[in-house]
Design a protein with these regions (language model features):
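Conserved N-terminal diphosphate/IPP-binding helix and adjacent helical/loop segment
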Residues: 1-85, 91, 95, 102-120
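Short, intrinsically disordered, charge-balanced linker/junction segments flanking boundaries
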Residues: 119-130
C-alpha cells in the first residue's frame, strides 16, 4: 500500500470515527434549542481533525507492517483505528493548547474555540485548563 493511499485511508477513517463519536445514540433527543450548538460542535470536531501530516498514524501503521503485522482484515482494521485514535488524541491536545494560548488559528483555519465562539458558547471555556 502506498503512503498516499494510506494517508487517504487514515484521513477518511478519522473523519468517520469522529463523526460517529459525536453522534447522539439512537433514540436520544435534545431540546430543539440545542440542535444548532450540536451541529456546530459536530462540524468543528470533524474540521479540527482535518489536515496535518499524520506522521504518528503512518509510523504506527508502518511499524505494524514491519513487525509482520497480521494481514487479516480484522486486525488491519483494528490497527488502522488505533493509529487514527493516536491522531485524534493529538488533535485534542492541539485544541487544548490553542485554548490555553488563546490562539486564533490552527492549520490555517480558526482554532476550535474561536470557531465556536458566539451565542451559546461560553468565553470562559478554557478557565482552569492551564
Amino acid at each position: 500500500m502506498s503512503t498516499t493511499a494510506t494517508l487517504d485511508t487514515v484521513e477518511t477513517r478519522i473523519a468517520d470515527l469522529v463523526s460517529t463519536f459525536v453522534r447522539l445514540p439512537q433514540g436520544v433527543r435534545l431540546d430543539e434549542s440545542c440542535e444548532p450548538i450540536l451541529q456546530a460542535t459536530t462540524h468543528q470536531a470533524v474540521t479540527s481533525s482535518e489536515g496535518g501530516k499524520r506522521l504518528r498514524a503512518l509510523l504506527a501503521l508502518d511499524a505494524y507492517r514491519a513487525l509482520g503485522g497480521d494481514a487479516g482484515r480484522e486486525r488491519r482494521d483494528a490497527m488502522l483505528d488505533l493509529s487514527c485514535a493516536i491522531e485524534v488524541f493529538q488533535t485534542a491536545a492541539l485544541v487544548h493548547d490553542d485554548i490555553i494560548d488563546d490562539a486564533d488559528l490552527r492549520r490555517g483555519k480558526p482554532a476550535a474555540h474561536k470557531a465556536l465562539a458566539g451565542p451559546g458558547h461560553d468565553a470562559a471555556l478554557g478557565v482552569g485548563l492551564g
